[in-house]
Structure formats: C-alpha cells, structure tokens
C-alpha cells in the first residue's frame, strides 16, 4: 500500500501539469486563430484546477494505475467552436496540434529537469522519479493524441488535411470514435501506434537537449 501511495504521488504532478498544458495550449491556439470560446470560459490558464475533470483527471488515472501500473487521463473538454476560426478547415489542424506539441514541450522540460537533478547530485530518489514520470506521461499523451481517429486531436488534424469530400466522410466516424478507441486499446492494437510515436518523441527531446547533456557530462 505504501508503494502504491508513493507511485501515485510520483505521477500526480506530471499528470496534472500535462493535462493543464495540453488544454491551455489548445485554448490559446484557438484564440490566436479567432475562436475565443475557451478564453471566454476561462480555460486559457495554467491553473490546473480549472482543467480538472472528475473522471478523466482523477478516477481514470487512479483506475489505470491500479489495474495496469500505468497512468493515463485527460482534462475537462476544452470548449472549441471551429466554425469561428478565421479559416476553419486549415486552422483546426493548428488548434488540435497545439495540445500534443505542448505535451512534447513538457516532456522536454521534464527531461531537462532530470538532467539538472543528476548534475546537481540530488540524492533523493523522489524528484528523479517525478522527472521520469513527467517524460513518460507527456510522451504518452503526445503519441495518443496524434492517433488519426476523431474526435482525438490526430483525427481532427487528418480531417483538416483531407480534401473536402473525404474530410466530410471521415468526420462521420467521430460519434463512434470512443468505442473504436476502446476496442483498439482492448485488443492492444493501439500500442503499434503509441510506442513508436513515443520513441520518436523521446528521440526528438534527446536531440534538442543534447547540447545541455554534453555540457553537463
């Protein structure tokens, strides 16, 4: 029981920051391209309390950890009205891409934090574990949210990029997206997308941080 509590404590901060950055980034991008819905709702903020969803931020992360040893979750849905964007079809891609890119940036920040902890000879294990969890959680959200299935960000990005007729047809999948995703997770098909994307994300942040790694070596 003590170990479970420690591990929950390790993942709590990274999960909270990850979903906060994801939601705030999408709200900011939407405002940048003409949709002020999220801004008007007070969602363009780094205050995590605003983005907490009882199910996605608390219940699901706890349940997934207890069942699998892994943590996954999401924030309260960000209010977006793509029709209010200056160029709805094109700008939707940028708004949806903002969330995963925010998670990649957070993964980089946690990675650099880990490097600095090692360089500072911090002996306490807890902050190192938190930094590792931060990288892991954000790479997972980065990879998962780029999966090309609506209403996930990646699905809406694909709709934005497809020709109009194909985009309209593919958008019809959205009402069934949740059930399709559950099936893909249950049959472990999603791992064939998520794991390679997480690896690519890890390579990207390692390359970006390589000058600092060299200086601290």
Could you say what each language-model-derived stretch is?
Residues 1-217:
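Hydrophobic transmembrane alpha-helices and their immediate loop junctions
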């Amino acid at each position: 029981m003590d170990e479970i509590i420690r591990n929950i404590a390790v993942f709590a901060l990274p999960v909270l920051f990850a979903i906060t950055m994801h939601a705030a980034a999408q709200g900011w991008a939407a405002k940048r391209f003409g949709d002020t819905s999220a801004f008007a709702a007070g969602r363009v903020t780094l205050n995590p309390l605003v983005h907490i969803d009882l199910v996605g931020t608390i219940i699901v992360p706890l349940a997934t950890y207890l069942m699998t040893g892994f943590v996954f979750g999401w924030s309260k849905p960000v209010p977006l009205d793509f029709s209010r964007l200056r160029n709805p079809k094109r700008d939707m891609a940028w708004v949806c891409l903002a969330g995963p890119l925010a998670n990649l940036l957070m993964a980089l920040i946690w990675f650099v934090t880990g490097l600095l902890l090692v360089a500072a000879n911090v002996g306490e294990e807890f902050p190192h574990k938190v930094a590792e969890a931060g990288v892991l959680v954000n790479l997972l959200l980065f990879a998962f949210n780029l999966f090309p299935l609506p209403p996930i960000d990646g699905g809406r990005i694909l709709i934005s990029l497809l020709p109009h007729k194909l985009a309209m047809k593919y958008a019809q999948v959205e009402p069934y997206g949740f059930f399709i995703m559950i099936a893909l997770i249950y049959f472990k098909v999603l791992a064939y997308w998520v794991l390679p994307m997480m690896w690519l994300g890890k390579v990207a942040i390692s390359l970006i941080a390589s000058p600092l790694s060299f200086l601290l070596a």
